A protein has these predicted regions:
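Small-molecule pocket liners
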Residues: 65-69
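Weak global preference for isoleucine
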Residues: 31, 56, 63, 124, ...
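Ligand-binding pocket segment of bilobal, Venus flytrap-like solute-binding proteins
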Residues: 1-59
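A generic structural signal for short, solvent-exposed coil/turn residues
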Residues: 48-49, 61, 118-121
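Sequence-level detector for tyrosine residue identity
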Residues: 44, 54, 58-61, 88, ...
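Charged, low-complexity, helix-prone segments enriched in Lys/Glu/Asp/Gln
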Residues: 5-8, 64, 140-146
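Extracellular/periplasmic juxtamembrane helices and adjacent flexible linkers that interface
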Residues: 74-157
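Solvent-exposed, acidic/flexible segments
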Residues: 15-19, 35, 59-62, 78-85, ...
Length: 157
């Protein structure tokens, strides 16, 4: 698979600094043949930006990508926003919040909401990166640090 990834990187005309920038480059500047991105970005491009001009292809399995959410004591105490931050956190996984997430192309974690939107979110096998590759510190060092696997494979460009 290293050869496949090296070939993929070799054929990448632009390395953007973030997901939305890559989406814009692909969908509005028409640079590139394929956009490898998060599910919500793919749906955003297909449904909002280009009215289904692009086909979304799901891999047979993919990484479980979970965004961390936390109340940062020093920040909320300084700004006086603790109650709002805690209320947000408590309601984030509620059915209405998950419904809103689904409407914004984010895969709901609530099983009932996910079932309601199953046409938009096909079943896909996921894996936990920590179980497969170790702690984040090791993952970052191995794959993304200076001289790491990403640098090695992209230098073959």
């Amino acid at each position: 698979t290293k050869d496949f990834v090296a070939a993929l990187l070799k054929n990448t005309p632009v390395f953007e600094n973030g997901g939305r920038a890559a989406t814009t480059t692909f969908s509005q500047r028409n640079i590139g043949d394929v956009l490898v991105t998060f599910e919500n970005e793919a749906n955003y491009v297909s449904k909002k930006l280009t009215q289904d001009q692009f086909e979304i292809v799901y891999p047979s399995y993919t990484i479980l990508s979970e965004a961390p959410v936390a109340v940062v004591d020093s920040v909320v105490d300084k700004k006086g926003t603790r109650s709002a931050a805690e209320a947000y956190l408590q309601n984030l996984w509620s059915e209405p919040a998950q419904e809103l997430a689904a409407n914004l192309y984010l895969r709901p974690r609530n099983a009932e909401v996910l079932a309601k939107h199953k046409a938009d979110f096909p079943e896909i096998e996921t894996f936990n990166p920590n179980e497969k590759f170790g702690p984040w510190e090791e993952i970052m060092k191995k794959f993304f640090a200076d001289g790491g696997l990403f640098d090695q494979l992209s230098s073959k460009k």
